[in-house]
Structures are given as structure tokens and as C-alpha cells.
Amino acid sequence: MLEVRSVAKRFGPVVALDRVSFQVRPGELVGFLGPNGAGKTTAMRAIMQLVALDEGVVTWNGAPVDDAARLRFGYMPAERGMYPRMAVRDHLTYYARLSGLDAAAAARAADGWLERLGLAERAGDTVQSLSSGNQQRVQLALALLGEPDLLVLDEPFSGLDPVAVDTLSEVLMEQVERGAAVLLSSHQLDLVADLCSAVVIVDRGRVVLRGEVDDLRAASPVRHLEVEFASPTAWSPDGMGPRPPARRHRLELPAGTAVEQLLGSARAAGEVVAHRYGPPDLSEVFRHAVGRPVDEAPAPSDAEAGSGVGRR
């Protein structure tokens, strides 16, 4: 099990991580979420021992992460760190050897992932000749070599087309099913909600919310009512003011609101063909937790503005 325990990191005056704690268990896929600049990349680099922490500890199976443990980790950084003039297959076999595989096993692993990720026909091409999406696939293959016990993936879906997203999603679920612990960051919250059993949401270097996705949605203080009319209809829900004509109206309500009266006013306004009432989706849970959308960075403090260093 991966445990991040009260980790803290400053870059000059900027607090990148402020006593961040969470766990990822074997066979669990956890979404690591936050706005731009929240501290996600710094935390992931700390897990991989690429950042020296000021406080706290990162452990794997109860012991501090060391070089031996890191050999069982697969890491996909947000910034590509590949050799641009090296052939794709050579790249994979080289990294597989670095992770401890012998030459034959490294070749088998490289060929297997090239085939699985749709890169077999590009095996002899240089990395720099690939599209950004195919470079992303190579980066993922590097992380998957050797069937790692822990996968740390920083924005793995960035730049991928829908077919590649589906392939990657299948691969990640296969890794979870074989017992790997998986931590991934992404701004695609609908995708995270589909894949991840739990999420950790960070903002300004602190954990602001964590738990099972379904539990967090159920515990939200708001609910959504969506009403669909047969044709564009103006509607004035009680106490909410008039709404312009539309086929679909969506209301955000306090949890526990009795909706029958609202539905009655909707039926009085026009022909209602469908309605749905329930907890918010993950993007709304996120917005309520941090107070802004996932792709909006926090306003810098005076210290941050003058430091030239930001969180990732």
C-alpha cells in the first residue's frame, strides 16, 4: 500500500504541499484532482523521490520508499522525458533493462506493450517523429514495463484521441484487476468518475476532500433537478425567478428539498416528458470543494507572484 503521510514542501516562500496525507491500496484506482497549481505534480514527484520533502514521509507497504521500492513503481510524468532520436522499441527495451528485466524479458515486454497500445507499426520510428498522442502512448508504455506494483500517472489522458482514451482506460482497469495500486491525475472529471473508485482533491497544497466517489456525491449538500419539456418552455420555479424558454432546465437545490412542488409548477408551465433528481456529478463536487473549475488556477499571493515558482 502507498501511504503519503503529512508531507510538506516549500519552494522559497511558496507552500507547494501543506501536510498532505492519503493512501492508495493494491487493486485501487484513485483519482488525484485539483485545479492548476494545486500541488498534484509536486506530490507525485515526491512519491517517486524526485523531490526532497521538508516534512512527512512516503511509504510503500509500511516502509519508507527507497530505490528498491521504486523499481516496482511505474511513473508517467506530465512532461515527456524521452530521448527524441531513439527508436520507440529501443526506448522501451532500454527502460525495461533499467527496471531490472533481462534482455529477453525486456524485448518481450516492449513488444507486448507496443502491440497492446497500437504502436507496433511505429516500433522503428524515432520518438520525435511521432505525434503528441503517440508520444503519450510511448510514455505510458514506459510506465507499464515490468508489471509495476504502483502506477503514478500525471495527466495520462492529455492529448489522446477518443480511441486512445478507451484503450488506456481498458489498460488501467486491467492493471487494477491484477492488483496494482494506481494513482492518476486528470482534468477530465467525467472520465475520472467512470474509472476511479476514490478521489483525493487538493487545493493550494492541501487536501480539501477525499473518499469514495459515490460517498462524496451522496454527502454533497446540493442536489440537481433536471426537467425536460416537450418543447422550449419558459418556467418560473417557486422562489427562483423566471427562466427563459428551453427544453431542459437544470436546478441546483439544497439536499432534502421537496421536489414535488417544483415538478408541479413545471407541469403547469408545459408538458414535462422526463425529469431526474439526484446528487451532483463529480465536477460539481469538485467545484463545491475548491470554489472554482478544475482548469482555473488560484490567484497568486504576493509571495507566489514574486517567487517565480508555482505549484503543479
Each predicted region: which residue ranges?
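Conserved ABC ATPase "signature" region
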Residues: T93, R97, A105-R122
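Hydrophobic anchor residue at the start of the ABC signature
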Residues: L140
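ABC transporter nucleotide-binding domain
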Residues: S169-P254
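Conserved ABC transporter NBD signature motif
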Residues: E55-A69
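Short, charged/small-residue-rich alpha-helical element at the C-terminal edge
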Residues: V222-R292
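Catalytic Walker B motif of ABC-type/P-loop ATPase nucleotide-binding domains
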Residues: L151-E155
